[in-house]
């Protein structure tokens, strides 16, 4: 089979190498999945480039650990073979999910993974759509509903609104009749307005932490500013929720959050993702035409190195999706 291997950190177009390798064999409670579609995510960028540097403490200081040699954390595909203890699926089942709690490896034609990493794919969504949902949609839902405790008619800002999480977060916020401002690069603003944002800002031209607008809830997909700046634009009892970003800013929040509780009624949170939680609920919204998948692509399997670089450059509109075995 073909798979993308990485041995050293670096430029995705250089270090992601397409190789021929043996098809893996499922052990115990693993299943072998024929990968039909995968996506590009923040972990894929970090595993490939070693950036932000703090992620090297997780993935390997000088090079990715051997088990991370094949990146890829979201998958939609077909069960091809069962390990001896696998009981949740049968051969031929269509499955999908965020596999990051159990490992990586979806930048390949076949993937072996613990059966608990996946769920049955609904019949009414394509493999490409299914691959785009698990990580981004659950992050958006957990960030807004579970952590941010969104309420009707709130004023919300999404920093990084033009990406995969941002596009799902917009749609979920609109279910609560929220007024939603999106922040991203100027090249994405027209598409973001078409998706339904009430207001869009080019972060290169306007610093939303210095204008007169204030917000009940901020969902931060970038975490690229100081907490003190967000404090200025949060309304009393407002909530700031980070889903990831620059390691220095994330560490700042971990250390400062207890201090902020002492003198402010504004709340600062980080999402600790529960992978694949509420996929059935998210599918019900999709089925009722309440949300849709904003797909950047799909691109062909040979475009993965280019697509990882596209993600890192922040040029994607929605979720970058790769067709593997169409």
Predicted feature locations:
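Glycine-rich phosphate-binding loop and adjacent beta-alpha segment
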Residues: 224-288, 324-326
